[in-house]
Amino acid sequence: MEVQCQTSFCQNEDGFPKLLRTCTVRLGIRSQPDYDGREFVDHGTEKCVVTVYIGSSPHHVEWSVTAARHRFKDTCQVVARKALRTLCQIYEEE
């Protein structure tokens, strides 16, 4: 099984990655969301697992979220949306 690894800030991706970056900046998170993905073939099916790492802010520690789909570009959208949902829960009271 061949595994291809990819790390990206997804800076040029529209949609949820762009919205996630905008939200993290407004919440005082200085580091960019960092996407770490692995594409591989499992039993003849293309799969991709991406983890997005969100840096710490003045009031919260760093955290991460993982999602799985089929391609890196699509999985970045899914994991960014999942991170936005988590971000809303963490910062709900602020």
Question: What name fits each language-model region?
Answer:
Residues 1-62, 69-77, 81-94:
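N-terminal segment of the canonical double-stranded RNA-binding domain
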